[in-house]
């Protein structure tokens, strides 16, 4: 009987810890590129495009960047064009 009580106590204490951690994590809602005064998605703007590329040179998914599907497609096309025109590297060098 003591073992079952200890197991239930540890399970509840772990559940409380997880719930407490989730309280402090607030995710921004909405697309950062759909707000007023947002920068225009263009292949000639590498400063904007590099924010949506990982350290290894891969395009970040929308679940990480929180960009809507329409803007994500525009970003992907702009990044591809910028790579072809050598405005962005295909693979980033390790520093």
From Swiss-Prot:
GO terms for molecular function: small ribosomal subunit rRNA binding; structural constituent of ribosome. SUPFAM superfamilies: Ribosomal protein S18. Pfam families: Ribosomal_S18. It comes from the Bacteria. GO terms for cellular component: cytosolic small ribosomal subunit. Keywords: Ribonucleoprotein, Ribosomal protein, RNA-binding, rRNA-binding. One of its GO terms (biological process) is translation. PROSITE patterns: RIBOSOMAL_S18 (PS00057). InterPro entries: Ribosomal_bS18, Ribosomal_bS18_CS, Ribosomal_bS18_sf. NCBIfam families: S18. Part of the 30S ribosomal subunit. Forms a tight heterodimer with protein bS6. Belongs to the bacterial ribosomal protein bS18 family. Binds as a heterodimer with protein bS6 to the central domain of the 16S rRNA, where it helps stabilize the platform of the 30S subunit. HAMAP family: Ribosomal_bS18. This is Small ribosomal subunit protein bS18. It comes from Rickettsia prowazekii (strain Madrid E). The gene is rpsR.
């Amino acid at each position: 009987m003591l073992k079952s009580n200890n197991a239930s106590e540890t399970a509840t204490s772990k559940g409380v810890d997880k719930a407490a951690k989730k309280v402090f994590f607030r995710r921004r809602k909405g697309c950062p590129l759909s707000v007023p005064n947002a920068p225009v998605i263009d292949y000639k703007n590498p400063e904007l495009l590099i924010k949506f590329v990982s350290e290894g040179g891969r395009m970040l998914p929308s679940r990480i960047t929180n960009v809507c599907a329409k803007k994500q497609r525009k970003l992907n096309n702009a990044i591809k064009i910028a790579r072809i025109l050598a405005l962005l590297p295909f693979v980033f060098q390790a520093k």
